[in-house]
Amino acid sequence: MYNKCDIIIEIFDIRINKIKNTDFKFCINRWKERFKLELRKIKSIKQIRNIYKLYQNSFPKEEKKPFGLILIGVLRGNFEVFSIEKKKNDEKNRNSYEFKGLTIALKHKDLVLLDYLAITEEARSYGYGSKTLSFLKEYYKNYRFFLEIENAEDENAENYEERQSRKKFYLKNGFSPFPFNVDLFGIEMEILGYNCSCEFSEYLELYKNQFGGIMKKKISENIFLVEK
């Protein structure tokens, strides 16, 4: 007679044997990799260089802010930049890390806009994007945390499938659409929030707070509400 424990072991053994050994090892290694991930505030020139290079290579020209202004924003407290890093298995140097990606967030009052998230090409099969979002959702749990994506409902867009995939990724990670879109310097963007929402006026104020003087006027003239 089999008891319940024996049956569970048999089922587990059968399912494991259906997986190729190499595939199983890859799944286990990928699972282990995710738990070594850390988000570290920039403290070195090396981190800044890594972030700058990935930033330049990951986003379209029309969507990028001048990197120097982002660094100034960090000093002013308007921006928060993290280097996504994995601790190396190096017994000789236990404080050695590998660069895996970046996050750049814009802060104002209780609002946090995840302005940029990028993972290095070689690290994209390990679930680092989802793990990073988990870290950020916990880190900003006392804020209204949201992000922008290109309008995923524009079927005429050249990168329509990519937009759809990006939206599905964020929805899978617990984000949901705001009741409005925005025209951001000529690009229609959807706003996705994590258990939150905000008024368009608050969203606009967040951007105006980035820069002073002439830029405030430029922002007012180039960011518009798009009703759904």
Regions found by a protein language model. Give the residues of each.
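A conserved beta-turn-beta hairpin within the catalytic core of GNAT-like acetyltransferases
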Residues: 107-114, 124, 143, 188
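Conserved acetyl-CoA-binding loop-helix of GNAT-fold acetyltransferases
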Residues: 119, 125-139
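Conserved GNAT acetyl-CoA-binding A-motif
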Residues: 140-162
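Conserved beta-strand in the GNAT
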Residues: 83, 96-106, 112-118
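A short, internal acetyl-CoA/4′-phosphopantetheine-binding micro-motif in the GNAT/acyltransferase core
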Residues: 117-124, 151-153
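Short amphipathic alpha-helix that is part of the acyltransferase structural core
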Residues: 27-67, 202-206, 221-223
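C-terminal "cap" of GNAT-fold acetyltransferases
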Residues: 163, 183-228
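Active-site rim helix/loop that mediates acceptor-substrate recognition in acyltransferases
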Residues: 56-91
